[in-house]
Structure formats: structure tokens, C-alpha cells
Amino acid sequence: PEKGCYHGAFPPLYGFDPEDREGSTDQCAVALFEKLVGKQLSMILWYQNMEPGRNFSEMQTVREKYWGKNYQGKYRFFLYGWLPVIPTQQMANGELDDFHKSYFAEVAAQEVRDMGPIWFRPANEMNGSWTPYYGDPTNYVKAWRRMYNIAEQLGVTAYNVFVWSPNSVSMPGTEANAMKNYYPGDMYVDWLGVSC
């Protein structure tokens, strides 16, 4: 926005007291969260593994389910937390190329522009030792650019948003693992996000 910030959340059902759940078994507790904080979310984050067998239709179903309006009367942004399950060297070498081609072709074919752009947040917190793709900035950058180039070739980057999102603190806190080393470059990133 021109001023302020977008209020978003990843509101899973766990953490809510059973009486607060009001009988809900929904995995994404959007209504409960909004009731708790007294605001409507402008953005919702949902995770999906970046691996063969997963597809855009799964995410589009979730998006349609939680597609609502924020306090400004605009539709919520839907942020896809896309998590690789293989090391960055394998991604940089093209092991996910077929997956990305298939996934982005599906995005291009199913894109519903009335719902607004899709916000892709691939391989976030790459500077944190808890991810399988941390500790290799050179190959991370190659992998990101490779993925982005495929999306661009299929026309997905013209309308959708790619969010680069490191952790606020690098762990380990070495110079080699500094978040700046993982940055793919302005040509490959639309927005910056930080996990705190």
C-alpha cells in the first residue's frame, strides 16, 4: 500500500482453544483469527511442497475457499509458500525443471485475473539451518533464477508476484550465510518479505 503495511497471517487451526474453534475442523482458521484480532486479513499464506505430484489446482482450491475481501473491500492476496524438499544444488542442476514447467503451465491456463495476482514465495528462510536448501547461496541463486526463467517463458511473471523472503536472522550467523548472498537480483524478485 502507499502507507502502512499489509496485515497477513498464516493462521492454522492449532493453537486455538477447542471452545474457540466453534466446532471448526478447518485447517486454515481465517475466520477465527480475524475474530481474535478484530481485523480482516489482507493476505493469507498457505504452504505447499515443491515436488512432483503437487499441482496448482490444489492451491487454487484453497485460494477459492478463502477468497474474501479485506477491510478496504479489495480481495485478499494469496501467498503460496512453496517449499523445496531437495537441496539447492539439485534444483540448480534442473531436477525440478519438469515440475516447474508443468506447474507454471497450469497457472497460466487456470489464471483467474479477477482474483488478483498469485504471490509466489518459493524457498523462504533459505538462510536458516532448518531448511533443506540452506547453506548454499550460489546454487540457491541459480535455482531461483532457473525457476523464474521458466515462469517468465510461460508468461507467468507478467501478472503474478515473486516474493523473496529470508529469515530476519541468519542461522548460523556467518558471513557466508548472510541473507544478501542468497538474493537472486532485482530482475528476478518483485517483492521482499522477511520472516521474523
Regions flagged by a language model, labelled:
Residues 1-43, 152-155:
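N-terminal module-boundary/linker segments of secreted carbohydrate-active enzymes
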Residues 1-3, 35-40, 71-74, 112-114, ...:
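Flexible, charged surface loops at secondary-structure boundaries
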Residues 39-51, 179-196:
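Aromatic- and acid-rich polysaccharide-binding/catalytic face
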Residues 167-171:
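Short, catalytically relevant binding-site loops at active-site mouths
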Residues 17-37, 55-65, 100-105, 173-184:
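Short, acidic/polar
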Residues 46-166:
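Substrate-binding cleft of extracellular glycoside hydrolase catalytic domains
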